[in-house]
Curated annotation (Swiss-Prot):
The lineage of its organism: Bacteria, Pseudomonadati, Pseudomonadota, Gammaproteobacteria, Enterobacterales. This is Penicillin-insensitive murein endopeptidase. Murein endopeptidase that cleaves the D-alanyl-meso-2,6-diamino-pimelyl amide bond that connects peptidoglycan strands. Likely plays a role in the removal of murein from the sacculus. NCBIfam families: PRK09429.1. Disulfide bonds join C44-C265, C187-C235, C216-C223. The gene is mepA. GO terms for molecular function: metal ion binding; metalloendopeptidase activity; serine-type endopeptidase activity.
Length: 274
């Protein structure tokens, strides 16, 4: 478990040591009406909002990385979710990476988070607020067993499940990525109220946080939405396939060259960086 915790911490801080991308040279949001452009893994944003770092309901981690920008819809979602969590006595919501001031590609750690519609939220809800030192170097709490087959009972709580459910029930949310073991636990605990589980999608890693994705805003005409998740709660064969051993001969896919930017994003870079 210690090795896994170290690996998680390394994953959260590794991006600081990698070569910068052109998008990191844009230090303030691009003025204009808010527009998410392109796809979640190949896009940008005009008119991003800054998430206020001071709030009674949430705390923002790693503010030195300046990844607390997003579409106004994302900022409002975070404020809405954290207010609901506070009303229910769940604890302080810990906000991780959103996006950069103009969106675009990160130098590591994320393939998406490019259009201002994604946010990582820690799956721990402290009852006392974290210090500035804790926020700058957050300790991820690994909720998943070493073999990846189930959550760690001593670390899992109904409050965590409630936070994920609250996020999934938000009308602006289309997907929430969590580790397969976390999805499995949610399936076991959900009871008869299961419609929200459709949005909770199993994905690699995500052992200590959930990755929340919003739908494209109606007035962002160049934003590319994903297809909706398949019908149903996603607790059947699809989920179980994540726990099966890899088929013989299965290899990791090779890293692909990033696709060309959407023309509007390339024009934005040309004007503000290149």
């Amino acid at each position: 478990m210690k090795k896994t915790a170290i690996a998680l911490l390394a994953w959260f801080v590794s991006s600081a040591s990698l070569a910068a991308t052109p998008w990191q040279k844009i230090t303030h949001p691009v003025p204009g009406a808010a527009q998410s452009i392109g796809s979640f893994a190949n896009g940008c944003i005009i008119g991003a909002d800054t998430l206020p770092v001071q709030s009674d309901n949430y705390q923002v981690m790693r503010t030195d990385q300046r990844r607390y920008f997003g579409h106004p819809d994302l900022v409002m979602f975070i404020q809405r979710l954290s207010h609901q969590a506070q009303q229910r006595g769940l604890g302080t919501v810990l906000i991780g990476d959103m996006g950069m001031p103009a969106g675009g590609r990160f130098n590591g750690g994320h393939a998406s988070h490019q259009t201002g519609l994604d946010v990582d939220i820690f799956l721990q809800l402290p009852k006392t607020r974290w210090s500035q030192a804790q926020l700058l170097r957050p300790q991820a709490l690994d909720l998943v067993s070493r073999d990846g087959k189930h959550v760690v009972p001593s670390r899992w709580s109904s409050d965590i499940a409630s936070l994920i459910k609250l996020a999934a029930q938000d009308n602006d949310v289309t997907r929430i990525f969590v580790n397969p073991a976390i999805k499995q636990q949610l399936c076991l605990d959900a009871g008869n109220d299961r419609d929200w589980l459709r949005k909770v999608r199993p994905w690699f890693q995500h052992r200590a946080h959930m990755h929340v994705r919003l739908r494209c805003p109606a007035d962002s005409l160049e934003c590319e939405d994903q297809p909706l998740p398949p019908p149903g709660d996603g607790c059947g064969a699809e989920l179980q396939s994540w726990f099966e051993p890899p088929k013989p001969g299965t290899t990791k896919p090779e890293k692909k060259t990033p696709p060309p930017l959407p023309p509007s994003c390339q024009a934005l870079l040309d004007e503000h960086v290149l």
